[in-house]
Curated annotation (Swiss-Prot):
GO terms for cellular component: cytosolic large ribosomal subunit. One of its GO terms (biological process) is translation. Disulfide bonds: none annotated. Part of the 50S ribosomal subunit. Pfam families: Ribosomal_L13. This is Large ribosomal subunit protein uL13. Belongs to the universal ribosomal protein uL13 family. Keywords: Ribonucleoprotein, Ribosomal protein. PANTHER family: LARGE RIBOSOMAL SUBUNIT PROTEIN UL13M (PTHR11545:SF2), RIBOSOMAL PROTEIN L13 (PTHR11545). GO terms for molecular function: mRNA binding; structural constituent of ribosome. InterPro entries: Ribosomal_uL13, Ribosomal_uL13_bac-type, Ribosomal_uL13_CS, Ribosomal_uL13_sf. SUPFAM superfamilies: Ribosomal protein L13.
Length: 160
């Protein structure tokens, strides 16, 4: 039996819509990374972009487990200005309450993808939006019920 390698003409991309309301961030990001890479398809080829396009709505309503949104001992995000002593620290709770809560999902997914040209191309197929509306209605995205797959995927408490 020969190893299968998909050709560019054989790759078909679908549009998937995920509602992030009350979903656990890490579990959502792990599943989205698998879909973006195309590892959920039988025609997966490691060196080609064969994943689907993913649209995530209601990014501000994603949940964190445990005490990760706490400012004292929670989850921290670091960035550096490039100047000596220029490290900046923010918490996950502050990011979710800011004007751009979709960044927390983008960072989680980006860090689960490979850090090379293909990973950057696959990350460009992710679209995250703050509210219920999105401009991709013409692509007719298929709603993916991520919350119904496992009871651990959803969090009902107001943790943040």
């Amino acid at each position: 039996m020969k190893t299968y390698s998909a050709k560019p003409a054989e790759i078909s991309k679908k549009w998937i819509l995920i509602d992030a309301t009350n979903l656990v961030l890490g579990r959502l990001a792990a599943k989205v990374a698998v879909v973006l890479r195309g590892k959920d398809k039988p025609t997966y080829t490691p060196h080609m972009d064969c994943g689907n396009n993913v649209i995530i709505i209601n990014a501000e309503q994603v949940k964190l487990t445990g005490d990760k949104s706490n400012a004292k001992n929670g989850k921290f995000y670091y960035r550096h200005s490039g100047f000596p002593g220029g490290i900046k620290v923010t918490t996950a709770g502050k990011i979710l309450q800011s004007n751009y809560p979709e960044r927390i999902i983008q960072l989680a997914v980006k860090r689960m993808l490979p850090s090379n040209k293909l990973g950057r191309k696959q990350f460009s197929n992710l679209y995250v939006y703050k509210g219920q509306t999105h401009p991709h209605a013409a692509q007719t995205p298929v709603l993916y019920d991520f919350a119904g797959k496992n009871s651990k995927n959803i969090r009902n408490q107001n943790i943040v």
